[in-house]
Each structure stands twice: as C-alpha cells, then as structure tokens.
C-alpha cells in the first residue's frame, strides 16, 4: 500500500466539502498506518467535489469529475472488447 510507505498524507478539499469530509476524519485516518501524519485542509482553489491527496511521494487527484471520467473510460473499454 503506497500510503503506508509515505510519512504524511494531506487531504485537500474544497470549502463546500470541508464539513462533510472533516466529519469522516477518524474513518479516513484509520486507512493509514499509525506512523503516518494525516491531515485534512481546506483549499480555496478547489471547487465543490474536488479533492487532492498529497503525500511526500505523489499527488493524486480524486475529484468527482476525474473519477467520473475514469468510469466513462472504463465503460468504453469494456464495450469495445
């Protein structure tokens, strides 16, 4: 698991999503090992439903629009075969 190999995880979320995501902080925290620093921060540059995971190794865009595009791509690939 990539998150277990990193020293820190920061979840950057939009202002409209901050309250909802913060309410899930303990559940999200339980997904990483105890030695990893975990934080959730509000990012004014993000729009609603946008979310970025930052570690000391990489940045992952897990925004809803990105996930939907990936889903569409997967469905297209399945129907081409």
Predicted features along the sequence, with ranges:
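Elongated, mostly alpha-helical coiled-coil "stalk/stator" tethers of large membrane protein machines
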Residues: 1-52, 56-81
């Amino acid at each position: 698991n990539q998150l277990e190999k990193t020293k820190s995880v920061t979840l950057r979320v939009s202002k409209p999503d901050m309250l909802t995501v913060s309410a899930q902080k303990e559940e999200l925290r339980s997904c990483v090992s105890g030695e990893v620093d975990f934080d959730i921060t509000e990012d004014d540059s993000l729009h609603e439903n946008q979310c970025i995971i930052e570690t000391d190794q990489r940045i992952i865009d897990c925004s809803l629009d990105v996930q939907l595009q990936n889903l569409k791509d997967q469905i297209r690939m399945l129907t081409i075969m």
